Amino acid sequence: MDIKACYQNAKALLEGHFLLSSGFHSNYYLQSAKVLEDPKLAEQLALELAKQIQEAHLNIECVCSPAIGGILAGYELARALGVRFIFTERVDNTMTLRRGFEVKKNEKILVCEDIITTGKSAMECAKVLEEKGAQIVAFGALANRGICKRTHSHLKAQEGACLPSHLPLFALEDFVFDMHKPSSCPLCATSVAIKPGSRGN
């Protein structure tokens, strides 16, 4: 399955000057919501991701995603794996588990995002779950921006990667684009970064 073509065909690979949720600036932006608006394609992508995870023979009892961006990807992945799905969300800028969702002690959970950039949101989600007694066994995403080390990828983890090196990150593809700190972004000389994502900075 050609993941990059899926993003291009869905007009989900945007070019311009963007402020990413990680705080970095980039000339490209992946808008996974455009890919996931097609239920059939969302199902196919999740099945591809589930296949990778199943081949690793991990015991996964639940998938959890940080809202909002990860919810559709996480739900479809949970469906493909045949496990339950929950999500965390921000309340006063703090990641929280609400809506009656509960986790059992030592419940084995995979944290799923639509896109992993630095993994900061995924780690905030994981921390909430671990504080409630869950065991994080892996991370997953449709796309990886190439900062975090992906299972089955030749790319190494880069500076700024937040995910722990001892847990696997499953993703369908690496999308490696130039990213800049706002203080040294060359794009800022000619334009202002726009924020098309799902959360503020």
Curated annotation (Swiss-Prot):
Its cofactor is Mg(2+). 5-phospho-alpha-D-ribose 1-diphosphate binds at residues 113-121. Its EC number is 2.4.2.10. The keyword Glycosyltransferase applies. Keywords: Glycosyltransferase, Magnesium, Pyrimidine biosynthesis, Transferase. The keyword Glycosyltransferase applies. GO terms for biological process: 'de novo' UMP biosynthetic process; pyrimidine nucleobase biosynthetic process. InterPro entries: OPRT, Orotate_PRibTrfase_bac, PRibTrfase_dom, PRTase-like. It catalyses: orotidine 5'-phosphate + diphosphate = orotate + 5-phospho-alpha-D-ribose 1-diphosphate. Transmembrane segments: none annotated. Orotate binds at residues 117, 145. Pathway: Pyrimidine metabolism; UMP biosynthesis via de novo pathway; UMP from orotate: step 1/2. It holds the Pfam family Pribosyltran. Belongs to the purine/pyrimidine phosphoribosyltransferase family. PyrE subfamily. Catalyzes the transfer of a ribosyl phosphate group from 5-phosphoribose 1-diphosphate to orotate, leading to the formation of orotidine monophosphate (OMP). Homodimer. This is Orotate phosphoribosyltransferase. The gene is pyrE.
